[in-house]
Amino acid sequence: MSTYSLSETHKAMLEHSLVESDPQVAEIMKKEVQRQRESIILIASENVTSRAVFDALGSPMSNKYSEGLPGARYYGGNQHIDEIEVLCQNRALEAFHLDPKQWGVNVQCLSGSPANLQVYQAIMPVHGRLMGLDLPHGGHLSHGYQTPQRKISAVSTYFETMPYRVNIDTGLIDYDTLEKNAQLFRPKVLVAGTSAYCRLIDYERMRKIADSVGAYLVVDMAHISGLIASEVIPSPFLYADVVTTTTHKSLRGPRGAMIFFRRGVRSVDAKTGKETLYDLEDKINFSVFPGHQGGPHNHTITALAVALKQAASPEFKEYQQKVVANAKALEKKLKELGYKLVSDGTDSHMVLVDLRPIGVDGARVEFLLEQINITCNKNAVPGDKSALTPGGLRIGTPAMTSRGFGEADFEKVAVFVDEAVKLCKEIQASLPKEANKQKDFKAKIATSDIPRINELKQEIAAWSNTFPLPVEGWRYDAGL
């Protein structure tokens, strides 16, 4: 006989759907789904994940607390949590074609920036030295960004950081200067990773530079991990000591992160033949928990396991090939329209447009594009002084490729971007000379009826609606 003691209203609170329980939140979610459906999503760090991943994310796996590692938890009842985490680890190694004797992986990291910090703390002391690609040159905040005025990233507070940069003329990483500066700075960690660098990284050269100063080579492949898993671009695993990645960008999984670490022999003494073994596994696992985190997000690990199975499929490889082909088509059309691209193009999933020769900044173009249902982001380009009004526009292909865009569609995107840039120039030119700030530009658009903006918004919404957003089954289940 049941001794259920909760009231019927409390029982209903636990069992009712979102729409029944909280219409206010449901309505906001409904509007966001509509925004995604009616928008051309060009943010390079975004993607459109699968129904199966959504199903795993919104599951009872979220109920369980599980500090520790599989087989060594601080709570009971984790036999199935252990099972899913081990499965996720195995699938991660398989997705990137790795030998478990040579590589291990931690799948508990909550996000990419914390994962990078966890690695740094695991392998070097406070005030240890780190070199990463400068943010305005295509790097990431978590690679130790700071300005002459302040330390921006917490990484630059805990560690001594020095940037390396691209050649201003070519837009390519200046490996020669990096090598010279590494000899002077002598970092403990050399980070090879980017957030707005469109060309391939020479991992072999990076390995040689790291070895010349006795540094660990840490590769942050957050943006390009899906391309690497599908072998569309070269893998860093042949050269790296540690590889980190987020899981929601080109990998098309849930929002999380992974840390891959070397196992086995690190080096052999040329004179004695004595082997030095890697000791990364325990250090990195300890840095993740208990160093920086408590219990992992088991629903995310479950969803990641699903995404990694998909990443090992032939369909996923075909998708990644299309991601790059679409980026190349976008590159070609933008060049035909007269635009300058940083590094003169792309080898990956995005292009970085240098708007400075045209006389407009990325912030204004980003804002106007948003008014016509195209979302992308302003981005610093080499030589920029301001992050708020940078000279670049970053355009990525993963999300719309997931929705079914092909090369002709991205050529059409380039035409829309071109029209937005021209509109920006017209609107700015219509303002008094003293009204030269972003707020003046935005106010003009907000208070004026500009027919072409309204026409483009409707045209793009209708066009985007013809490409499915893979949330329909989830949406119906949620009552949205």
Curated annotation (Swiss-Prot):
Location, primary (coarse class): cytoplasm
GO biological process, one term: glycine biosynthetic process from serine
Alphabetized GO MF terms: glycine hydroxymethyltransferase activity; pyridoxal phosphate binding
Pathway: One-carbon metabolism; tetrahydrofolate interconversion
EC number: 2.1.2.1
Top-level taxon: Eukaryota
PROSITE patterns: SHMT (PS00096)
A GO CC term attached to the entry: mitochondrion
N6-(pyridoxal phosphate)lysine modified-residue sites: 249
Localization, UniProt: Cytoplasm
Top enzyme category: transferase
Note: In eukaryotes there are two forms of the enzymes: a cytosolic one and a mitochondrial one.
HAMAP family to which the protein is assigned, alphabetical: SHMT
Assembly notes: Homotetramer.
Protein name as annotated: Serine hydroxymethyltransferase, cytosolic
Native species: Neurospora crassa (strain ATCC 24698 / 74-OR23-1A / CBS 708.71 / DSM 1257 / FGSC 987)
Gene: for
